[in-house]
């Protein structure tokens, strides 16, 4: 009976009904999305928000298309942006990825637009679905002016581990000024992020010599990198001898081994300038170097300021400060 024509007839009817229902539901979704786009283009944001709420389940300020305010902020068109705000456009409208106009302004380095948005109530610590804040975007673009404005309006300089780290992004792209501003606002100089490591480790990985030098001057831990991998391991994989010299001058441990049991020398390319530099550093350091490292270790992370208070002869002070 189960294999008879009646059974197969009912089975085909059931499959047809299920497929029809599925495609009808899909058609409704597409229709609502197109209708949302139509209202956004025509400027009817209130109706667009209502439709978006139906599609995305309660997120009333969220849709896939960027608003005119997003475009004005991204392009740095201050007059257009102020006009839209004066017309009552919500400064905290976000896209489906939770990108706000403030995110766009900071990514473009448009400080005037960013300030106008903040003065009109833009969320200074808004987070996208990828964990990026306006401050992260400002560090990405290298806009020190945007970084300062955001901090003035209460931006958090350091977030939880799972969010994108502004200081790591600044270091990665070699934006030293942004990095220094963040450090001046109490960001942990040795903040380790999974998959990235510490700011010094990132600077060595991307061979940002200026950032490496400044981080070491300000007291970054020379051997703190990414878990067992030290900044010297990261530098050894690259080709910049200057970074190797900076790290060893600040007392990097050449004998430290990573999770694979390898030292920095093991990671250097054979017969390369990096390998030669590491081999030259394997001998015992000079007594003056040992004394300098000992003094700086005793003074701690604040040694850069503390050395000036010791009232030492200028040549000795400059030596302790690596000048």
Curated annotation (Swiss-Prot):
Cell compartment(s), UniProt: Endoplasmic reticulum
Organism from which the protein derives: Pongo abelii (Sumatran orangutan)
GO molecular function terms listed in the Swiss-Prot or TrEMBL record: ubiquitin-like ligase-substrate adaptor activity
Keyword Endoplasmic reticulum appears in the UniProt entry: yes
Gene3D superfamilies according to UniProt: Ankyrin repeat-containing domain, SOCS box
Keyword Endoplasmic reticulum appears in the UniProt entry: yes
Coiled coil: none
UniProt cross-references to PROSITE patterns, sorted A to Z: ANK_REP_REGION, ANK_REPEAT, SOCS
ANK repeats: 64-93, 97-126, 130-159, 162-191, 195-224, 227-256
InterPro entries: Ankyrin-SOCS_box_domain, Ankyrin_rpt, Ankyrin_rpt-contain_sf, ASB9/11_SOCS, SOCS_box, SOCS_box-like_dom_sf
Family label: Belongs to the ankyrin SOCS box (ASB) family.
GO cellular component: Cul5-RING ubiquitin ligase complex; endoplasmic reticulum
Function: Substrate-recognition component of a cullin-5-RING E3 ubiquitin-protein ligase complex (ECS complex, also named CRL5 complex), which mediates the ubiquitination and subsequent proteasomal degradation of target proteins, such as BIK, DIRAS2 and RPN1. The ECS(ASB11) complex acts as a regulator of the endoplasmic reticulum unfolded protein response by mediating ubiquitination and degradation of BIK.
Subunit structure: Substrate-recognition component of the ECS(ASB11) complex, composed of ASB11, CUL5, ELOB, ELOC and RNF7/RBX2.
The name this protein goes by in its record: Ankyrin repeat and SOCS box protein 11
Keywords: ANK repeat, Endoplasmic reticulum, Repeat, Ubl conjugation pathway
